[in-house]
Amino acid sequence: DSMPMAKAEAEIDRGIAADETAVYGQVRVTPATPFFRFPGFASNPALLNRMAERGIVVFGADVWASDWEPMGPDQELRLILSRIEKVGRGIVLFHDTKSQTAQMVPAFLRELKKRGYRIVHVVPAGGNAR
């Protein structure tokens, strides 16, 4: 089932507004950090075009930690590192509401550095990020 365009845009706007309010204390017409990931990567060409028209960059992921599955931080670390090694680079998806992920991230960052990977800080064009 696909959601009607107007409803999808309204849900996107609510999500962006919630993020803007939580991070910056206000909602702006153009988000301070104009990045978006569709839940479940469930986009379509019309929504992607609309986001581009609004100047919002849509991200996907190359590897994910499957952190929605029950597992401990050590198991999650082994899983995500094995997936990164297979592809060699890319955007990693974590869910920040998962406690095992929060516990695992420091070890993950140390291991990436040890293996020669680097973290890239993505900022909006024009330097809008605060």
Range-by-range predicted roles:
Residues D1-Q26, A42-G88, T101-M104:
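Alpha-helical scaffold elements lining the catalytic groove of polysaccharide deacetylases
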Residues D13-A17, I91, E111-G116:
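A broadly tuned preference for mixed-charge, low-complexity surface segments
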Residues Q26-A32:
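Short helix-terminating capping/connector loops at secondary-structure junctions
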Residues P34-F38, V57-D62, G90-F94, I119-V122:
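Structural recognition of the beta-strand scaffold that forms the well-ordered cores
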Residues G40, T97-K98:
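Short coil/turn segments
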Residues S99-R130:
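C-terminal domain-boundary segment and adjacent tail
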